[in-house]
Amino acid sequence: MSEKVNSDFEDFSSDEETDQHNVLIQTKKKISSKDDIFSKKVEDIESENESDIEEEQKQEEKEDVEQPDKENGEKLDREVEEQASSTTSLDLKTEKLRQLVKSKAAKKSKHKTGVVYFSSIPPYMKPAKMRQILTRFGEVDRLFLKKEDDQKYKQRVKGGGNKKNKYEEGWAEFIRKRDAKLCAETLNGNIIGGKKGTFYHDDILNVKYLPGFKWADLTEQIARENDIRQAKLEMEISQANKLNAEFIRNVEQSKMIQNIKNSRKRAGKEGESADSHPHREFKQRRVETSRANAPSDIKQQSSGSKDLGNVLTNLL
């Protein structure tokens, strides 16, 4: 039947109709292909969106993981920078100290040093003030002031004196010898001077230049004095320990004797009297003598007379 319909259609249709029919069929096919392409594009877009979403999620996870790492890294960087800054400051300080030491050593090598001695220091004068006074005459390298003894300090404070530190004597080293000589000549036996009304204006210093004396000699002397002081302290401590040990031994002995007496008192008076006045017995010999005027009862008889008497008694 279909074949017949087609044949009939072919008989009554013209060429133009057939061409239009073919075009319509082709357009339907083309439309169907466009729909397919659109659906494919939509699917591609959805897949791309899904992939983009997945990538964004992954990136967010990575960022979440990397954020604490970055924070830790920043903290570590800050700590490293702080340590570096502290080390740099310490290095700068050490370098400055080295430069100062080198400069002082260079000055000492160029010039011969001189040492002056102060037999008395004005009351309550500090080393900083003394250095300020001495720098008028030249550059001062080292300064040493000796404090008073602890015993003197305690007595002074106990008597109502000032509680400030007091120095008895001192030494100062000038980088140039001529400055030390000038200081000794000008300050010895004279007032310190300066502005009127200052605390140390009218104090007199006794300064002496020590020829041929170096700072090493002073350090040796101080070390020797410290050794002597330490030896005296050790001797005093050993004597005190001996006295303490003897005192403890005497106390223990007295306690022991007291305990013995108490035990005897508890035992009774008889036992106490017997123990306190013991009765001793001694073997007594007969008194004999060979003197002619001695009484007959104590007169010593000779051995011959004794034998004769025995013989006569036997015979009778």
From Swiss-Prot:
<protein>
    <recommendedName>
        <fullName>Pre-rRNA-processing protein ESF2</fullName>
    </recommendedName>
</protein>
<dbReference type="InterPro" id="IPR035979">
    <property type="entry name" value="RBD_domain_sf"/>
</dbReference>
<dbReference type="GO" id="GO:0032040">
    <property type="term" value="C:small-subunit processome"/>
</dbReference>
<keyword id="KW-0539">Nucleus</keyword>
<dbReference type="GO" id="GO:0034462">
    <property type="term" value="P:small-subunit processome assembly"/>
</dbReference>
<feature type="region of interest" description="Disordered">
    <location>
        <begin position="261"/>
        <end position="316"/>
    </location>
</feature>
<dbReference type="GO" id="GO:0005737">
    <property type="term" value="C:cytoplasm"/>
</dbReference>
<keyword id="KW-0694">RNA-binding</keyword>
<dbReference type="GO" id="GO:0000472">
    <property type="term" value="P:endonucleolytic cleavage to generate mature 5'-end of SSU-rRNA from (SSU-rRNA, 5.8S rRNA, LSU-rRNA)"/>
</dbReference>
<comment type="subunit">
    <text>Component of the 90S pre-ribosomes. Interacts directly with DBP8.</text>
</comment>
<feature type="domain" description="RRM">
    <location>
        <begin position="114"/>
        <end position="204"/>
    </location>
</feature>
<dbReference type="GO" id="GO:0000480">
    <property type="term" value="P:endonucleolytic cleavage in 5'-ETS of tricistronic rRNA transcript (SSU-rRNA, 5.8S rRNA, LSU-rRNA)"/>
</dbReference>
<feature type="modified residue" description="Phosphoserine">
    <location>
        <position position="14"/>
    </location>
</feature>
<feature type="compositionally biased region" description="Basic and acidic residues">
    <location>
        <begin position="59"/>
        <end position="78"/>
    </location>
</feature>
<dbReference type="InterPro" id="IPR039119">
    <property type="entry name" value="ABT1/Esf2"/>
</dbReference>
<comment type="function">
    <text>Involved in the small subunit (SSU) processome assembly and function, and in the 18S rRNA synthesis. Required for the early cleavages at sites A0, A1 and A2. Stimulates DBP8 RNA helicase ATPase activity.</text>
</comment>
<dbReference type="GO" id="GO:0005730">
    <property type="term" value="C:nucleolus"/>
</dbReference>
<dbReference type="InterPro" id="IPR034353">
    <property type="entry name" value="ABT1/ESF2_RRM"/>
</dbReference>
<feature type="compositionally biased region" description="Acidic residues">
    <location>
        <begin position="45"/>
        <end position="58"/>
    </location>
</feature>
<feature type="compositionally biased region" description="Basic and acidic residues">
    <location>
        <begin position="268"/>
        <end position="289"/>
    </location>
</feature>
<feature type="modified residue" description="Phosphoserine">
    <location>
        <position position="7"/>
    </location>
</feature>
<dbReference type="GO" id="GO:0000447">
    <property type="term" value="P:endonucleolytic cleavage in ITS1 to separate SSU-rRNA from 5.8S rRNA and LSU-rRNA from tricistronic rRNA transcript (SSU-rRNA, 5.8S rRNA, LSU-rRNA)"/>
</dbReference>
<dbReference type="GO" id="GO:0001671">
    <property type="term" value="F:ATPase activator activity"/>
</dbReference>
<keyword id="KW-0597">Phosphoprotein</keyword>
<dbReference type="GO" id="GO:0003723">
    <property type="term" value="F:RNA binding"/>
</dbReference>
<keyword id="KW-0698">rRNA processing</keyword>
<dbReference type="GO" id="GO:0030490">
    <property type="term" value="P:maturation of SSU-rRNA"/>
</dbReference>
<keyword id="KW-0690">Ribosome biogenesis</keyword>
<dbReference type="InterPro" id="IPR012677">
    <property type="entry name" value="Nucleotide-bd_a/b_plait_sf"/>
</dbReference>
<feature type="modified residue" description="Phosphoserine">
    <location>
        <position position="13"/>
    </location>
</feature>
<feature type="compositionally biased region" description="Acidic residues">
    <location>
        <begin position="8"/>
        <end position="18"/>
    </location>
</feature>
<feature type="compositionally biased region" description="Basic and acidic residues">
    <location>
        <begin position="32"/>
        <end position="44"/>
    </location>
</feature>
<feature type="compositionally biased region" description="Polar residues">
    <location>
        <begin position="290"/>
        <end position="316"/>
    </location>
</feature>
<comment type="similarity">
    <text>Belongs to the ESF2/ABP1 family.</text>
</comment>
<feature type="region of interest" description="Disordered">
    <location>
        <begin position="1"/>
        <end position="91"/>
    </location>
</feature>
